[in-house]
């Protein structure tokens, strides 16, 4: 199993409806991406967030599934509108 973690800082001026859309669309990836076993995403509640407002964890069956996720059309469609709005960080590891 491979764990994909991410956190976002929103760029200035991003409206709440876009933030909510991001959460909904990330959750909606489940069932569309082969090998994506579980998706958890939510608004950060930690006082130690260093400005990261949204975080998530995705569990993939293996590295091949994680690699395929990166180029999957559904993921790419999400990234097309989301990337200009965020400052992201990602960490992936085998579990």
How would you name each of these model-derived features?
Residues 1-53, 61-68, 92-95:
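Short S/T/G/P-rich N-terminal loop/turn motif that feeds into the first structured element of a domain
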Residues 60-91:
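C-terminal structural segments of small proteins and small subunits
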